[in-house]
Amino acid sequence: MANYYTDIPELKYHLNNPMMERICELKERNYRDKEEFDYAPQDYADAMDSFDKVLEITGEITGEIIAPNAEGVDEEGPHCANGRVEYASGTKQNLDAMVKAGLNGMTMPRRFGGLNFPITPYTMCAEIVAAADAGFGNIWSLQDCIETLYEFGNEGQHSRFIPRICAGETMSMDLTEPDAGSDLQSVMLKATFDEKENCWRLNGVKRFITNGDADLHLVLARSEEGTKDGRGLSMFIYDKRQGGVDVRRIENKLGIHGSPTCELVYKNAKAELCGDRQLGLIKYVMALMNGARLGIAAQSVGLSQAAYNEGLAYAKERKQFGKAIIEFPAVYDMLSIMKAKLDAGRALLYQTSRYVDIYKALDDIARERKLTPEERQEQKKYAKLADSFTPLAKGMNSEYANQNAYDCIQIHGGSGFMLEYACQRIYRDARITSIYEGTTQLQTVAAIRYVTNGSYLATIREFETIPCSPEMEPLKGRLVEMANKFEACMNKVKEAQNQELQDFVARRLYEMAADCIMAHLLIQDATKAPEMFAKSAVVYLNYVEAEVEKHSSFILKFNADELASYRQ
């Protein structure tokens, strides 16, 4: 059977990035747990060996259980009866296997029953699972909601809830409502304090809630009477054991069928406040969403890998005009671009996760002791990098997943339109990635300030100073010219001082920045491991050079007066 980790050597390459030594040092507090837990690592090499073993176990379960179950789960899906969700039979098997392997609460401290893993190896597990079944990946990876509870909950909540997630219970984040999708400040689910019971009560409806019948819910609700904006919202913990929430229905979706997307009715449900009042949206949900967006980036890379695998296998097997179709330039052109997008997107994903790891670890240390001036500077640096890279990783990888799924079907020709082939499920599952946890348009909104304040350009210029192999130098020279075009476009838009114009071309600027950053990352990877990445570096540079030229031409020639022609 396939192993979804060992079969993809690029994963081990990214795991062994030099930044991991600093990440492990921070996460393990210089390996202090070894005195208390026999499974805690003794040193850096031991920690890396542990990550490798867990990833191999995840890859094995994915290949032997999750992947074979995927088609049946897609067809059966979950069911709703008496206000509760019943998972598909294959989903139950998948969950049981992951729980038995101890793959829950992976990033949580060992004192709560977790593995104390950094986010990077956990994100790799999420990618691996999504490559086999993106719908199940949603259910399993929602365990990372516990990061938000760990970060903002109190000690009592830590001791009561975190061990349950580490033992295999499930989570959901209940944010959106019928009239509050992207505009979360419009959330109206009502939270009132019950003086008699000394608890909060939740009343209202939530919609489009992934894994909505989970054991523990993080809920965004309006706690401040008379408010209508984000400052009236707080975050609450709802425990399914308390009762008071029913599943009204499971949505009938295009894809990710195994993942129950629910409409929930809160009827005087007992809940407790997480953190401080009024910070639910402006602080806690923002942290929750950043984690979720990294998760969708991982899911997208997994789907891109699955699409490439299916397309490559079919192109090698299918013969037309006396030879395998992979020998035709039209086909190997598609496959090479799919692989290049996959490699570039994965490079961006794990660069982002490493940034997140360092700033999160330093945040956690700051709750134990005062950071040194050097640590505060490091924390500030990586918090900014994580915040700027996350919308790029989510937006670009979700778009690439959709493009690769489209091309996978195209390679299959008429057969790709038939339900017998996995590519149609990959195509349907991929479609949601550029929509949920913030559409690509919202990722652009999150990223555009890093365009206009010069942060992305500064990162690109810093990457230009990193040495590369002689073989990569010509590509790097062309990449400098791409950055110059990006800078010219950025300056034109800033100098215009026209907000509507900036909003109109923001997506193009966002993609130009991402293209330059990913091309640099791929050149760095090709320098270190040419046997894995040299071809993709060439293909990707050719691809994004044309993309940057296209966007540059549009922006530099565009006149703001022409906006009137675009308004519908």
PLM regions and their residue ranges:
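Internal helix-loop-helix
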Residues: 59-60, 90-163, 167, 210-212, ...
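C-terminal helix-coil-helix/basic helical segment that borders enzyme active sites and/or dimer interfaces
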Residues: 343-394, 490-504, 523, 527, ...
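Alpha-helix capping/hinge segments and adjacent helical runs
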Residues: 2-5, 9-10, 17-19, 256, ...
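C-terminal amphipathic alpha-helical interaction region
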Residues: 454, 466-568
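A structural-propensity feature for long, helix-poor, extended segments
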Residues: 154-160, 439, 445-487
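A glycine-rich, basic-preceded beta-loop-alpha segment at the flavin cofactor/substrate interface
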Residues: 39, 241-244, 248, 260-292, ...
